């Protein structure tokens, strides 16, 4: 009896579950961890990079991408599903610009993606998208935005959030450490994102993909060397803090 609801996308189980949507959410939990942090004048995206094969080109393995000049997205889950969503979102951004002669707002394109995902939970012959996304950018008012969508088609605005395999651990870290002082400068916001990922990434900066977006500026991707410099700086700060603690205890 239960298997009937298990296989059907558009049929609720007697206790109110859409199992295929829940399975899509499980697919997200198996994806790489991604974190987004809204700073004062910046939005930071960081993603845990999985190890790349020796002969593979790293540039083809990206979990952060631009949707328009002022909007970008990071995702966790199935890369092939994400590619479809990204292409549809990019077309919508260009179509909106041609139609109304204004760029999309961050909330508009987030709502478009969420609506697309919701349609795939309610029609036969399709399955839900197995991705969650962090969508960030700036509107004309210059205020940084951060939204998160999930496979069910819901979306919410956040100050900071994480998705993917270790999202719970990273979110708990952000709840403890996200303060006005922690995002007072662009540099501090970047370091907070890296610190959050280092909670679950064991091999340091080489396995972190990092990007920032500022108002009226395109998406900036950080090189592995740049990320490593930040990691080194964070480690030095930790060592100094530990030394101060040990001196106080003595």
From Swiss-Prot:
Compartment(s): Cytoplasm; Nucleus
GO cellular component: cytoplasm; nucleus; proteasome core complex, alpha-subunit complex; spermatoproteasome complex
Keywords tagged on the record: Cytoplasm, Glycoprotein, Nucleus, Proteasome
Keyword Glycoprotein applies: yes
Main location: cytoplasm
Transmembrane segments: none
Keyword Glycoprotein found: yes
A GO BP annotation: ubiquitin-dependent protein catabolic process
SUPFAM superfamilies: N-terminal nucleophile aminohydrolases (Ntn hydrolases) (SSF56235)
Pfam families: Proteasome, Proteasome_A_N
Assembly and interaction partners: The 26S proteasome consists of a 20S proteasome core and two 19S regulatory subunits. The 20S proteasome core is a barrel-shaped complex made of 28 subunits that are arranged in four stacked rings. The two outer rings are each formed by seven alpha subunits, and the two inner rings are formed by seven beta subunits. The proteolytic activity is exerted by three beta-subunits PSMB5, PSMB6 and PSMB7. PSMA7 interacts directly with the PSMG1-PSMG2 heterodimer which promotes 20S proteasome assembly. Interacts with HIF1A. Interacts with RAB7A. Interacts with PRKN. Interacts with ABL1 and ABL2.
General function of this protein: Component of the 20S core proteasome complex involved in the proteolytic degradation of most intracellular proteins. This complex plays numerous essential roles within the cell by associating with different regulatory particles. Associated with two 19S regulatory particles, forms the 26S proteasome and thus participates in the ATP-dependent degradation of ubiquitinated proteins.
PANTHER family recorded: PROTEASOME SUBUNIT ALPHA/BETA
Recorded family membership: Belongs to the peptidase T1A family.
Protein name from the UniProt record: Proteasome subunit alpha type-7-like
């Amino acid at each position: 009896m239960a298997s009937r609801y298990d296989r059907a996308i558009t049929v609720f189980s007697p206790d109110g579950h859409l199992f295929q949507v829940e399975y899509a959410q499980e697919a997200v939990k198996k994806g790489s961890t991604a974190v987004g942090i809204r700073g004062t004048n910046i939005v930071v995206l960081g993603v845990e990079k999985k190890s790349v094969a020796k002969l593979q080109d790293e540039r083809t393995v990206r979990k952060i991408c631009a949707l328009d000049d002022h909007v970008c997205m990071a995702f966790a889950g199935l890369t092939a599903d994400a590619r479809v969503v990204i292409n549809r979102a990019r077309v919508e951004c260009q179509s909106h610009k041609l139609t109304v002669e204004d760029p999309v707002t961050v909330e508009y394109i987030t709502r478009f993606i969420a609506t697309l995902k919701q349609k795939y939970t309610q029609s036969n012959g399709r399955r839900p998208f197995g991705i969650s996304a962090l969508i960030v950018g700036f509107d004309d008012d210059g205020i940084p935005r951060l939204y998160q969508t999930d496979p069910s088609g819901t979306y919410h605005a956040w100050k900071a959030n994480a998705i993917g395999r270790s999202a719970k651990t990273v979110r708990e870290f952000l709840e403890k450490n996200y303060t006005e002082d922690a995002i007072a400068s662009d540099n501090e916001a970047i370091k907070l994102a890296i610190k959050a990922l280092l909670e679950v990434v064991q091999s340091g900066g080489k396995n972190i993909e990092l990007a920032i977006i500022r108002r009226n500026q395109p998406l900036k991707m950080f090189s592995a060397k740049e990320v490593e410099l930040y990691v080194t700086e964070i480690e030095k700060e930790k060592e100094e803090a530990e030394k101060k603690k040990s001196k106080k205890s003595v």
